[in-house]
Amino acid sequence: MNRTMKALFALGMVVGAAAAEAQGLDPALIGKPATDSWPTYSGDYSGRRFSPLTQIDQTNIKNLGLSWVSRLAAGPGTPGRPSQAFGPGNPPTIVGGETDDPVPVRNAGRISGAVLQVNGILYVSVPDNAWAVDARNGTVLWHYFWKTKGGTHIGNRGMGMYKDWLYFETPDDYLVSLDAKTGKERWHKPIADFNEQYFSTVAPIVIGNHLIVGTADDLDAPGFLQSFDPETGELQWKWYTEPEKMGDPGSETWPNLDSMRHGGGGPWLPGSYDPQLHLYYFGTANPTPAFSGVTRKGDNLYTSTIVALNVDTGKLAWYFQPSPHDTHDWDAAQTPVIVDGEFKGKPRKLLLDASRNGYFFVLDRVTGEHLLTVPYSDAPNWSKGIDKSGRPIPNPEKEASPGGVLVAPDSDGIVNWEPPAFDPQTGLFYVSTDDIYSEFYRTEPNPRAMQGLNGVFEQRVGQGGNYITAIDYKTGKIVWRHLQPSVSGTGSNDGLTATAGKLLFGGDVNGNLVAYDPTDGKPLWHTHIGQVSNAVETYMLDGRQYILAASGDTLYAFALNF
């Protein structure tokens, strides 16, 4: 047998063994804390990104070393690349899509979402691409490529899984279902009108027999959340982020029907879920026009809003709006974190949210009652105070003007899409923050021409630093802040993950993967891999705990060197 045949035979044995191991995912198990798996966007439904694994801890973190590296080649039939220093290349690509003339896309290979880990297999996605990878050694088992019509390839937040089936959204607005064992397509369904310039990036969330997906648009179309049957792909319900007609609840926060129908607010990040209350919590995007409120006077519900929906019906249970009348593209899209804990001496079911606008909120997740609002950075200067419902009051003098106005934070926010973490052992909420100041100049004298993201020039003029910030949710006080060392003085935030091994993992602005002490932010270990995408994940296989991180188009798995 020649070397090529031996390599192909070896790959077949690996794929066969991995496929035999994969037995699918029971949806009922997603709600349990992640131990030997990472079955949904945040590891479980809570949004806390906390793992109970303890094999890797403060006493042995110095022995953490690289176990394997796997670079994922996006595109149609890209030649295979070795997944390890030696070994077979990638398997043939499975191609899907509805066009014979796909639009070429550059730089679509960055992993910017969650990587699922179920039964020893990693499931990874970027725009138009999905892979299965052996979680023990990084071998690519299959690759699926979607021939796209185009759209906004801003990122893909990951996949959802139900039994033996995977689901992901495409930038040209399709929901695609794959066989997890083979990568072959089961079906695909349009979920939005591509001609209206919607784009779809959200990681689908599986809740029982519901597949929850969101769709967004920065060009004046209304956003919506939808639920599909994971078996058939049939639509179960659809909830718009603006009222559908005048007279509906919330319509009084818009001046007219036209502004409401072009109001934006699409959800573009996954939410969290309470199985006891049967409520799904998520945030919506900014209203449009993004930087001018002249044509949309009012609070503009339900944009830049935290929303609770009944999973079975799609009916609104409650809402809270962190950024009323948002005119700086801040959204409220961050994944809410749900915690059961004491607040002011009483046990409460809580929802925690660090918003892009620089304010930290604590809500009662049963009723939506506001409990706490406090800035978690010194930077925010756009609010005149807090109203009786706990919402910051926008200062109209901080809207873009021809002469420019200094606003903090900038349009990217104190935090953007990178997920926070909550550690029940310390009781602290952790978030990566970036204090940046911008001058906002209005460049379009006609407010009716300021559609979408147009009509404003933003000049970033200063930065107060990148931090990891630890917040006591009971008081809103900052317990500690760790200033990220930066050669340039600027950088990007990364998501965070906490473990029961008394570790907090994240990336820094210089491209290091870092383990911190969650009690004080002291760095305990680091290694350079490039900017960490999304956030670290962790899982246990064969008695060995792995730390998984992505940077660019590459996966890095670390484990203890025994």
What are these regions (language model features)?
Residues 38-42, 105-128, 151-175, 199-222, ...:
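Repeat-blade elements of multi-bladed beta-propeller folds
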Residues 54-192, 499:
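N-terminal cofactor/phosphate-binding cores enriched in small/glycine residues
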Residues 66, 141-146, 180-195, 231-242, ...:
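Blade-edge beta-strand/turn elements of extracellular beta-propeller
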Residues 89-101, 244-267, 342-344, 383-413, ...:
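Surface-exposed acidic, glycine/proline-enriched linker/cap segments
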Residues 324-335, 375-381, 386, 409-410, ...:
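Conserved blade-ending motifs and adjacent loop-strand segments that build the rim/top face
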Residues 433-435, 460-522:
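Loop/turn-rich, solvent-exposed surfaces of beta-rich toroidal or solenoidal domains
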